[in-house]
Amino acid sequence: MSAMNQHQQNKASLLERLIFNNRPVVIFLCLLVSVFLFYQATQVRPSTSFEKMIPLEHPFIQKMLEHRNDLANLGNTVRISVEAVNGDIFTKEYMETLRQIHDEVFYIPGVDRSGLKSLWSPSVRWTEVTEEGFAGGEVIPQTYDGSPRALEELRNNVLKSGQIGRLVANNFKSSIVDVPLLEMYPNPKNQSELIKLDYRQFSHELEEKIRDKYQLQNPNVKVHIVGFAKKVGDLIDGLVMVVGFFGICLLITLVLLYWFTKCIRSTIAVLITTLVAVLWQLGLLNLVGFGLDPYSMLVPFLIFAIGISHGVQKINGIALQSSGADNALMAARLTFRQLFLPGMIAILADAVGFITLLVIDIGVIRELAIGASIGVAVIVFTNLILLPVAISYIGISKKAVQRSKDDAVREHPFWRLLSNFASPKVAPVSIAIALLMLGGGLWYGKHLKIGDLDQGAPELRPDSRYNLDNDFIIRNYSTSSDVLVVMVKTTPEGCSTHQALAAMDELAWKLENTEGVQSAISMVTVSKQVIKGMNEGNLKWETLSRNQDVLNNSIARADGLYNTDCSLAPLLVFLNDHKAETLDRAVAAVQAFAAENDKDDLQFQLAAGNAGIEAATNEVIKQSELIILVLVYICVAAMCMITFRSFAATLCIVLPLILTSGWSEVA
């Protein structure tokens, strides 16, 4: 070993000597781990659940879970709208197709069969007032035979059923099959064993057994499907497209890396070590018992981007060192010595940023945080250790070394211009401008909306099939797919008292006069209709009676709008959409009413329904946002102080982060 090499060896840290004096062992261990984790990565499966997607500890969700058994049809549901392309629903062919779809859905695993509802359900009935009193029956009677007379009778029954705008479209061109789901259901092969609902499989069954099958069977029928399970299924199906997009990103990165480094060897080395990092992350994800959900499937992209960034820094450093080093090994060691600690601090900062996401009490977000933290930690081994070791063997081309030397001395006009902002004369002006922009960002940030800004599923493209189906239902039905459920809790047998019904009626009126609310339905709606009917259909009697016997009789037909002991009555609020401001207005109206009217024996509790879950999620994000930012700043500042032992240097690093946070809220 030359004198220079001996001197460099003496300056090396224990970690550097341990790694570079045992390079074959390092590569062998990495290869061994890669083979094992590759096998584990092949076992990763798409996985999600309803409860992982919601903030379980939020008061809204706690109340929903507390009354889960009484709200069986108001949680995780799918709505299938069967459209008659030509004509209306009152044809023999359409009704037969609707019956077949109803029966087909009934046998799909995961469906809560007791709550399945369509025009063919015996529980869907009509009622009218006649000279003899009340008359009623099933909307589709047992005598239905598809004849013109039977179809005319069906039309009359639908008009008298109160289902127009709910199960039947306002224009009579489509009707809905309402499908409540079970998160866990008995295994058909072993009834004592419970199976978790597989959203991807369920979505595929809806496509194959319902949409594809019946659209092909009856060209005059078009099927639209919306609901949480369908949305998640579509997101998981997007995984195939994500893999394809990842391949495209790989090719683009290959071209850009080669253009930058001018060395195919180092380009391939960076790509391989970064792909190893992605592979390890997926393998470790399976080892800790996680799968890929619609959110965590984006983590490999993130790990790939971070790995490429650190890899480019390493290659650039080795290229600069190569001009003065004896060989590739020495250049790799000098670069490792120079960049390992800064790289480690940067990776730790990334990991801390992801770990702070654990503050958000949503299962999929926490799994994303853990998965991303694992992936970032893996980069320490693949890009900070394995990459320099690999380059120490294969070296860097002379062309790449020359390019690096030229870049080090070349002054680019743009960067020269930008550097003027840091000159002593201009720096005060730069700081003043930055502070003004921060103030503007904080002021505009007050108007930042937490939640969705558009109709439909923001996770999917506006022209996706799901969002088009959702738009169809919003346009053709009075009851949208966005439902906020207020749970009215009373003492047993207390939900039918005049006090409780009058309070529900007042809340429904307030909500219906709130912007963004389509309608509100509760047992009061049925009670008023029945009381009117018992008084010869006179509209003057469409109100609540103070006679308790009359009230008790009037709610007998309000099936599904109160529980078995009449201690809970859901009030269903149908919204135009689930935009942030729509949810905020509806929730604020309910909370203001509850603050004034809650008593020991009468409470208005939020919230169930998909809109209630969205509102709870928005609140959790809003409450966690500032906490996460503060934690990130504290952790980054602490790491900077430990590393640089300089308060000024720490400020120079942290203050731009704060400025960026303020400005990002403007965007």
Give, region by region, the residue ranges found by the protein language model.
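Extracytoplasmic
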Residues: E96, Y144-I264, A502, Q548-V636
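Interfacial segments of transmembrane alpha-helices in multi-pass membrane proteins
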Residues: I236-L292, V359-G363, I627-A667
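Juxtamembrane segments of multi-pass membrane proteins
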Residues: N420-F421, K425-S545
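Juxtamembrane extramembrane loops of integral membrane proteins
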Residues: S47-L116, S496-L501
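Short amphipathic beta-strand/extended segments in non-transmembrane regions
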Residues: S81-A84, L98-T127, D505-Q529
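Helix-loop junctions and hydrophobic alpha-helical segments within the transmembrane domains
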Residues: Q321-L348
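Transmembrane alpha-helices and their membrane-interface boundaries in multi-pass membrane transporters
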Residues: S2, F28, L287, F304-N316, ...
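Signature of alpha-helical transmembrane segments and their immediate interfacial
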Residues: S2-T48, V389, R403-D454, L468-D471
